[in-house]
């Protein structure tokens, strides 16, 4: 049987967890095996910026950062489960990637 590997990415971890819960509910309703959600390492993107625009004075810095949270879910690729998975509403700032493996 094929397996579907689902990778979720987003900057808001609460929205990522909400989508994980929706996928868990689909797996329970359809009765397919589910492994996960497996939390992958959070990537921190840090950008240091000088506060002073002209370069004079003391060197004070602002540090802006964005955290990218990732989750990995494996489930059996049942046709009914995948159809329901494709119909779920996912927030537009959450990236979802589905790969079918044999």
Curated annotation (Swiss-Prot):
Q: Which UniProt keywords apply?
A: Ribonucleoprotein, Ribosomal protein
Which range is the signal sequence, renumbered to this chain?
none
| A UniProt-annotated Pfam family | Ribosomal_S10
Task: Give this protein's Gene Ontology molecular function annotations.
Answer: structural constituent of ribosome; tRNA binding
Question: Could you provide one GO biological process annotation from this protein's UniProt record?
Answer: translation
Taken from the UniProt entry, a GO cellular component term is: small ribosomal subunit
- PANTHER family found in the cross-reference section: 30S RIBOSOMAL PROTEIN S10 FAMILY MEMBER (PTHR11700)
* Similarity comment: family membership: Belongs to the universal ribosomal protein uS10 family.
Query: Subunit structure of this entry?
Result: Part of the 30S ribosomal subunit.
User: Which function does this protein serve?
Assistant: Involved in the binding of tRNA to the ribosomes.
Q: What is this protein called?
A: Small ribosomal subunit protein uS10
